[in-house]
């Protein structure tokens, strides 16, 4: 059994009040932007995306390296869902799927997984509340599969998902009106890697 933590490394009391990361720990924590900012600054948007993706993957590797110094029972960390901004958003999905970007992401994330395996740090993701695989809405189910597979892409680039529960888990709530049967019906729509990585949390 392991005890982990969620997304942010806060190591100083000055950071606890508003979960605000100080300069010392910034290199271990991710950055983000908003879809509104990207829409309103089209001339700078792509460069912002490059800067954030590079920072966030590097921060994840540094975070895992830091967690790897903890006692074995505490070597577990949940990585944030906002690693790649707007990965499934209509205005950005085609941009993210360009081959040169996908190739860059694979090269960027591979060292993250290598670090986790070398230091025996278990990784997890937890897609947000709008990822509802058992929703009664076909559109929401479709969007939820896209969102889940986004997390699978990150795990795949890190070298996970090749076998069942091989060092990374992606957790979702059952939620949704279709309940457990909805999850069962969704499984065939997921990639083989996704089925190896999924874990279910009962609401």
Question: Where in this protein do the model-derived segments appear?
Answer:
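Short, electropositive alpha-helical surface patch
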Residues: 135-148, 180-191
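Conserved, mostly hydrophobic/aromatic
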Residues: 126
């Amino acid at each position: 059994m392991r005890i982990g933590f969620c997304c942010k490394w806060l190591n100083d009391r000055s950071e606890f009040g508003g979960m605000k990361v100080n300069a010392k720990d910034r290199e271990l924590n991710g950055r983000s932007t908003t879809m509104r900012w990207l829409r309103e600054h089209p001339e700078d948007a792509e460069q912002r995306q490059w800067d954030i993706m590079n920072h966030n993957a590097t921060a994840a590797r540094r975070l895992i390296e830091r967690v790897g110094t903890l006692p074995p029972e505490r070597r577990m960390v949940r990585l944030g869902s906002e690693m790649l901004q707007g990965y499934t958003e209509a205005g950005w999905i085609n941009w993210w799927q360009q081959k040169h970007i996908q190739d860059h992401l694979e090269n960027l994330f591979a060292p993250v997984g290598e670090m986790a395996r070398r230091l025996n740090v278990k990784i997890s993701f937890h897609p947000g509340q709008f990822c509802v695989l058992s929703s009664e809405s076909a559109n929401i189910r479709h969007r939820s599969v896209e969102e889940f597979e986004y997390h699978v892409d990150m795990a795949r680039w890190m070298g996970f998902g090749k076998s069942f529960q091989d060092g990374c888990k992606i957790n979702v709530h059952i939620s949704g009106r279709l309940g457990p049967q909805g999850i069962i019906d969704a499984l065939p729509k997921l990639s083989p890697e996704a089925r190896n990585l999924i874990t279910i949390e009962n609401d």
